């Protein structure tokens, strides 16, 4: 409990009154009239369902020997947006590669880009080893 004197809190010993709702008698569905109404509603629902079924079923004419899939579908040539973006990115990449790989310097840069980290380290180690051997050489 807080120390604030302006707030009053109900004590647990005080009783509170709860308003109860008046209960009503449930509806009796066993009467003859209600059964007839239910049957009548069911018949209407069945009629509606059969009408809906008959209107939504399209008439299909089949030819014997026809293929299930038609190879001349015009939508088959269309490409999804994701695929189109991928193709455009590949095209841009190839164009930039061709642009940079034309000259002699471009070819050397392409070779350097193609090398892995491991091959670069191996080349550096070979260069250092060659320098050490050159330094240790004895001239007569």
Curated annotation (Swiss-Prot):
InterPro entries: SVIP (IPR031632). Residues 27-40, 73-140 have a biased composition (Basic and acidic residues). It is found in: Cytoplasm, Cytosol. Residues 41-51 have a biased composition (Basic residues). GO terms for cellular component: cytosol. Present with 2430 molecules/cell in log phase SD medium. This is Uncharacterized protein YGL108C. It comes from Saccharomyces cerevisiae (strain ATCC 204508 / S288c) (Baker's yeast).
